[in-house]
Amino acid sequence: MATSCCPAWSVMAKKLFPQFTDYISMALTPMVLTARLQKQKDPSCRIAFIGPCAAKKLEASRRSIRSDVDFVLTFEELQGMFEAKNVRFEDIPKEEEVPLNQGTGAGRGFAVTGGVAGAVVDAIHRMDPDREVKVASAEGLDNCKKMLLLAKAGKYNGYLLEGMACPGGC
């Protein structure tokens, strides 16, 4: 089994290792799932995702996953928009802070290499504390390709594999 929230990793794995396609998790990424849930509440809303990853643009545009995300901006693009409009955050009046609902630490770790696999292992251990779960993770597409080549050679039979295109994660 293989998993990742990284669209670049998923596309690379399916393209270069089509024999693994059926073993790559079809679970929706947090971006897609959040957009889909919001559109169910309000079908007329527009969803914008802002993050570090340009590959999320590809993910949002793929018809095969019906992402429900209308716009994707990278942090760099957003910064460019702020600069073009001379937005200065220090000039914006402060408002009373509204506490956010706390997510689990596992969810916050999805953007880090091995984060999704770590959350899966934690969930398995809550249900079956003695179950052995073997995990292999890689960061950077070259290392991800090496990991999948080793899996193809049978070195990771029974492992949960996770890859991230960017070193360190998103």
Label the model's feature ranges.
Residues 1-170:
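Iron-sulfur-associated redox domains of electron-transfer enzymes in respiratory
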